[in-house]
């Protein structure tokens, strides 16, 4: 039988519509400096749903069970690269530093070869006028929040690199292997990604205006809310990519593969979609005003 103290320590959470039940101890002990610990420390009044007492948090609840399991037992889950990238994004939002470090360490362990440079090495290099990392292996390192504009990463191995909030304007990623990397909220205006491998990469919230992604592998990428205005996506493989809410106004998707791609709520005004197969793409709520749809399969 549960005591009144046990009942009072229980917390009911509604994370983007998914319901969870846990305890205050779980939310506060392992990661005491996290946003969740701050929310349930008793220092703040919590707004609950009137009937059942759920605390609502406006986030995607898909991976929150992994967050709870981490807070309970400290075990890093084994996930695919896209799911791992999404979990890392959630850990970043909730300020779960231990979980972030654990995910990054686990991704480094699965890498075949260690990175040839460290974050400190990169910071030293970018003090010079012209920086090139062509063909260099930088897999798994944290390059978040740096100014790497104009840097040449062509042919580099950038698997699972953390580029969150990094300024990469006009950087070159030609033929680079950036599978599973995280570019969340990065500045990628006018970047060149021709023939790059970005399979499973997280590009949600990025600024990709006028970026060149021709012939790139974008399978399973997340572009949710990204700015892709006038981007070049000719012959890119967007199979299973998520572009929900993205802005693709004036983008060129000639010859792009869009099987099972999600364009729900996306802005495709004046986009170039000639002879593109949209039959297996999800277009609910997409704005196609003025788009060139000549020969498109719908």
Curated annotation (Swiss-Prot):
Its UniProt pathway annotation is: Protein modification; protein ubiquitination
Q: Where is the BTB domain?
A: 9-80
Q: Name one matching Pfam family.
A: Pentapeptide
Signal peptide positions are: none
For this protein, the parts annotated as crossing the membrane are: none
Expression sites (tissue/organ): Expressed in all tissues but preferentially in roots and flowers.
Name of the protein this chain belongs to: FH protein interacting protein FIP2
Source taxonomy: Eukaryota, Viridiplantae, Streptophyta, Embryophyta, Tracheophyta
